[in-house]
From Swiss-Prot:
Quaternary data: Interacts with PKZ1.
Basic and acidic residues bias locations: 88-128
Region (Basic motif): 109-128
Protein purpose: Required for normal zoospore movement, formation of appressoria by germinated zoospore cysts and plant infection.
Polar residues bias (residue ranges): 70-86
Keyword Transcription regulation: yes
Region of interest (Leucine-zipper), ranges: 134-155
Main subcellular location of this protein, as a coarse class: nucleus
Protein name: bZIP transcription factor 1
GO term, biological process aspect, one: cell motility
Gene Ontology molecular function, alphabetical: DNA binding
Length: 234
């Protein structure tokens, strides 16, 4: 078996191109002391490639420029601590959560206030209705009491008017006769009240007259009975 065809053949001179060295990016430069941040490293690499006169140095393309600036910006933003003005995504999420909780708390407070107002309004209406019902009950009781008083007076008047007028006249003459026979019994009203016959006569006369009986300028049963007692003492 012939293996000569698999042997490597020499390359042509036309396939060899000029080698161009890459621009080295270092963290330390002659004019800058101390370590640099990724942002400064990317920017210095771009500046160094622009300022060289070597035509063999490959200058970065526009895409690489923007990418370097973007990488440097991201590195700068990532290096800012919590005290910086730029907020991290988690801080924004926390802020959004706090705002949502605050709004939800305000909504709950508003609903609670509305519920309290509704409860107070119902309580005031209930108290007002109870007060009005009590006032109506009092007015009804007063009306019934007045009606009962008038009915009582009417019944008493009917009972008195059922007696014969001659019986009343007879009781008056009977009173006068007792007074003439026993004048010491009419010395005072208290003495007259102590005598049983006098009490009976006075009770019959009081039942015979109405409560608004009148005789001359006298009005009422008590005034009339007092006048009769004075007549009996002459």
């Amino acid at each position: 078996m012939n293996l000569s065809r698999f042997a490597p053949s020499p390359s042509s001179d036309s396939l060899i191109s000029t080698l161009r060295p890459r621009a080295a990016v270092r963290r330390l430069h002659s004019n800058i002391t101390g370590p640099m941040t990724p942002f400064k490293t990317a920017v210095n690499a771009y500046v160094a490639s622009e300022g060289t006169d070597n035509s063999y140095v490959v200058r970065p393309r526009l895409y690489n420029d923007k990418r370097a600036q973007s990488d440097g910006s991201n590195a700068l933003l990532s290096s800012i601590g919590p005290s910086g003005t730029t907020k991290r995504p988690r801080d924004e999420m926390d802020c959004f959560t706090d705002t949502h909780k605050h709004k939800r708390g305000d909504g709950n407070k508003s609903r609670r206030r509305e519920q309290c107002r509704a409860n107070q309004a119902r309580y005031r209406d209930k108290q007002r209705n109870a007060q009005q019902q009590l006032e109506r009950s009092v007015e009804q009781l007063q009306s019934e009491l007045s009606t009962l008083k008038h009915r009582n007076l009417d019944l008493a008047s009917r009972q008195r008017t059922n007696q014969s007028p001659w019986n009343t006249v007879a009781e008056v003459f009977r009173l006068l006769g007792v007074c003439f026979r026993s004048p010491w019994r009419v010395t005072c009203v208290q003495e007259m009240r102590n005598h049983s016959e006098m009490r009976q006569i006075l009770a019959i006369l009081e039942r015979s007259f109405t409560h608004d009986v009148a005789m001359g300028d006298l009005r009422g049963i008590d005034a009339l009975m007092e006048q009769l007692l004075q007549f009996s003492q002459y």
